[in-house]
């Protein structure tokens, strides 16, 4: 079955399968951001607080598992040696990552069809990224920044898994 993505959650623009949605001033993620986000920078958004919520939508309820891929990098320093990120989707816990390296991170989680909420034929969901080690650089003497940072979000993509060939 082909899943046709488009607006399902009120006010949320289409999510096209396999097409990255970029964060930042030049990206298209802004309408998907619900709460817990700092102002856009050129090519990314930081979370601002312990939770950051993101809306996803599809025109039809998916009949197969989809994957959410999020690219970014953690806020780390000598006083913040790691970031733990838990992903909830419509209340279900879908993933946990412990990140202790500054290089780019790929967070990937499977979203089963039953995790989506339906409205008419459309499907929608709310991703909540819980980042409990988010810190204000000002509070730990690292900068004058008052934002509560944990992860720098660069892009997200909804993808359908590629079927495995038998043989």
Positions of predicted regions on the chain:
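Glycan-recognition and processing domains
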Residues: 1-63, 76-80, 132-167
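Short beta-turn/strand-loop junction motif enriched in small, turn-promoting residues
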Residues: 73-76, 114
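Short loop/turn positions at the edges of beta-strands in beta-sheet-rich folds
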Residues: 60-62, 91, 101-103
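Extracellular carbohydrate recognition and processing domains
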Residues: 94-121
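Cysteine-clustered segments with highest specificity for TGF-beta superfamily mature ligands
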Residues: 120-136
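Generic structural signal for small/hydrophobic residues in well-ordered secondary structure
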Residues: 68-70, 156
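Short, surface-exposed beta-strand/strand-loop-strand elements in extracellular ectodomains
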Residues: 80-93
